[in-house]
Every structure is written in structure tokens, then in C-alpha cells.
UniProtKB/Swiss-Prot annotation:
It holds the Pfam family GKRP_SIS_N. One of its GO terms (biological process) is N-acetylmuramic acid catabolic process. It catalyses: N-acetyl-D-muramate 6-phosphate + H2O = N-acetyl-D-glucosamine 6-phosphate + (R)-lactate. Residues 68-231 form the SIS domain. CDD domains: SIS_Etherase (cd05007). Pathway: Amino-sugar metabolism; N-acetylmuramate degradation. Keywords: Carbohydrate metabolism, Lyase. It is an enzyme of class 4 (lyase). It comes from the Bacteria. Homodimer. One of its GO terms (molecular function) is carbon-oxygen lyase activity. Specifically catalyzes the cleavage of the D-lactyl ether substituent of MurNAc 6-phosphate, producing GlcNAc 6-phosphate and D-lactate. This is N-acetylmuramic acid 6-phosphate etherase.
């Protein structure tokens, strides 16, 4: 039988009770005695805290979005690194980028302690191996051109600290996300995002408010960076990969809404453009064939708005 604790030093660990995420929430001290109605109401009320915590971190989020965008525009990649819930949230956000923005699967990557198997089966003990964070990044070819977002709700995860330290060491962009004040747990990074959601209703269960705030922050980082990279026109995902019926319908509606293209003509354009909404729009608006539209888009750094303007069209 495998010893799950063979890699752990079983001497008494540091007391983490001072960490904000480990403290007891006075609102829920009688949690097990509440009625179902009171339980649900309490959770709904407490889940207002993540939004407030994320709003308080707007300056750091702006800084992070701009820095990530600069790196991606220069050929770098974005990596999320975490263990447990934090790592799973990073994997989730990374996995959504290709279908939403037609980005290369390598552009945004989620790195989870324990690998893909840890998505379904908890491997939280692996977070205690500091060298593993660096090793996992190295195995993916992480370089000085890339960005790392290290996610550690309590700010003490050795796996994440090791990865962030390595990113700083090689002059990559190192961004930290945690849910405790900096004086409680410092992290090696250039941009430090603190989402202070407070003690959890279920003491120490950071999959709750801390996880919600983290998901919100990751949504902001990836989506805003993709907007800055020109993968959005207005509020439409014009780089959507039309890979199923739902997404094909969305692509057709985008063509109709932006250029008044009916569905039959839209289907023809999407077939000719190999499913690219941007190319289809340029074909229709500028009277180009697919090859010329693709060439124009490349010349304009994949920015649809400037490509349209260059052929005298001002779709808004």
C-alpha cells in the first residue's frame, strides 16, 4: 500500500491559524445548527465578499493585464500554477481560451500540482514539494518571455512559491494571487494581487469565497488580455472557434449582427473562411476572397477593426 505521507516531514508544522483564510468566521460558528433556509441565505450573503475583494484589487489587476498583454504580444505565453482548488481554477480558465478566442492551446496553460489526474482525485500533499513547481514549469519549456500567475489562496503553498521564485530568477513575469494580507504571507513576484475575502463560512475551506474571487480574477486577466490582443470586436468573440452547433450558431449571429449577413450567406462565408468569423467579415465587407482577407488580417496584426478601416469599411 502506498504511503501518502512518505514525502512529508511529519514533525509539527508551522501554525497557520493566523492566516486570514484559516481564521474562524463568527457568522458561522453555529453552522451545523442552522436550518436549510438559514444556511443558504448565509452563503448567499457571504458570497458578496468575493466581488468586493476583487474590486479592491483593480489597480493590481490593471497592471497585470497590461503586463500579460505585452508579453503575449511579443510571443510569450501565460501559465497558471497552483495546487488543489487554486490549480484546478487555473486549468479551467486556460482550457476555455481555445474555444472562446481560437487561441493556440499552448498560449494559456494551467499547471496543476499532481498533473491531470489531480483534476479528479485530490493530490493536495504534492503542494508541499517546492521544487516541483519549478520542475513542472521547466518541463513545459517555461522561459523568460513567458508570464506566470501563481495562485495560492493562503499564500504559503511551497509548490507555488517555488514556481514564482523560478519565474523571477529567469526574469519571466511573476504574478501572485492570494487571499491573505501581504504581511501574513509574502510571495516572490513582480505583481502581487491580494483578494481579501475573509474567513470562510466553513473554516479553512478556500474552495468557497477564496475560490470564487480567484475565478473572477482569472476571468478578468485572460479576457481583458484577449480583448487587448484584438480577439474581440465590440463585445463579440470574433475569434470564436465554430467547432459545434452552438458555436456555429453564435458565429452566424455575429455575422448578422455586425454586417447584416443572413444565415445562408453566413454559412457560405464561414465555409470559405474555414470557420473564421474575422475572415468571413472581411470577405463580406471588403469584397475579398478568403486568401486576400486572411492576408489583410495578418498585415493588420489580426486586429479586425484596423483591417476593416484599411479597406474603407467602418462596421461598428
Amino acid at each position: 500500500m502506498t504511503n501518502l505521507f512518505e514525502h512529508i516531514n511529519l514533525h509539527p508544522s508551522d501554525d497557520r491559524g493566523h492566516l486570514l483564510t484559516e481564521q474562524v468566521n463568527p457568522k458561522s460558528e453555529c453552522l451545523d445548527q442552522l436550518s436549510t433556509e438559514s444556511l443558504v441565505t448565509l452563503f448567499c450573503e457571504e458570497d458578496r465578499e468575493p466581488q468586493r475583494a476583487v474590486a479592491a484589487a483593480i489597480p493590481e489587476l490593471i497592471q497585470a493585464v497590461e503586463a500579460i498583454t505585452d508579453r503575449l504580444r511579443s510571443g510569450g505565453r501565460l501559465f497558471y500554477l497552483g495546487a488543489g482548488t487554486s490549480g484546478r481554477l487555473g486549468v479551467l480558465d486556460a482550457a476555455e481560451c481555445p474555444p472562446t478566442f481560437c487561441s493556440d492551446p499552448d498560449l494559456v496553460q494551467g499547471v496543476l500540482a499532481g498533473g491531470s489526474s489531480a483534476l479528479l482525485k485530490s493530490s493536495e500533499g504534492l503542494e508541499d514539494i517546492e521544487q516541483a513547481g519549478q520542475k513542472d514549469l521547466q518541463q513545459r519549456g517555461f522561459s523568460s518571455a513567458d508570464c506566470l500567475v501563481g495562485i495560492a489562496a493562503g499564500g504559503t503553498t511551497p509548490y507555488v512559491k517555488g514556481g514564482l521564485a523560478y519565474a523571477k530568477e529567469i526574469n519571466a513575469l511573476a504574478i501572485a494571487i492570494s487571499c491573505v494580507p501581504i504581511e501574513q504571507a509574502e510571495l516572490p513576484c513582480s505583481i502581487d494581487i491580494r483578494l481579501l475575502t475573509g474567513p470562510e463560512l466553513l473554516t479553512g475551506s478556500t474552495r468557497l469565497k477564496a475560490g470564487t474571487a480567484t475565478k473572477m480574477a482569472l476571468n478578468i486577466l485572460s479576457t481583458c488580455a484577449m480583448v487587448r490582443l484584438g480577439k474581440v470586436f465590440g463585445n463579440r468573440m470574433v475569434d470564436v472557434a465554430a467547432t459545434n452547433i452552438k458555436l456555429m450558431d453564435r458565429a452566424l449571429r455575429i455575422l448578422h449582427d455586425l454586417a447584416d449577413v443572413d444565415r445562408d450567406r453566413g454559412s457560405e462565408l464561414l465555409q470559405a473562411s474555414d470557420g473564421s468569423v474575422k475572415v468571413a467579415l472581411l470577405m463580406h465587407a471588403c469584397g475579398l476572397d478568403a486568401e486576400a482577407a486572411q492576408k489583410l488580417l495578418i498585415e493588420q496584426n489580426n486586429q479586425l477593426r484596423t483591417a476593416l478601416a484599411s479597406c474603407g469599411n467602418c462596421i461598428s
